């Protein structure tokens, strides 16, 4: 991908980067293990971003 990106694409990539994290340990404890996985996790090789 090019170094110079439009602002909209840059913001969408930043949002995708932030949402690609696991569920924090304190959330798992607080919800008694109800939310154990982040089902929106994405691997950079396997899944393609529509940006």
UniProtKB/Swiss-Prot annotation:
InterPro entries: Ribosomal_eL39, Ribosomal_eL39_CS, Ribosomal_eL39_dom_sf. PROSITE patterns: RIBOSOMAL_L39E. GO terms for cellular component: ribonucleoprotein complex; ribosome. Signal peptide: none annotated. Gene3D superfamilies: Ribosomal protein L39e. One of its GO terms (biological process) is translation. Belongs to the eukaryotic ribosomal protein eL39 family. One of its GO terms (molecular function) is structural constituent of ribosome. This is Large ribosomal subunit protein eL39. Keywords: Ribonucleoprotein, Ribosomal protein. The gene is rpl39e. It comes from the Archaea.
């Amino acid at each position: 991908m090019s170094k110079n990106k439009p602002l909209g694409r840059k913001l969408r990539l930043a949002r995708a980067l932030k949402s690609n994290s696991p569920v924090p340990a304190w959330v798992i404890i607080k919800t008694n293990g109800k939310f154990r996985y982040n089902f929106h996790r994405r691997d950079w090789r396997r899944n393609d971003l529509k940006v």
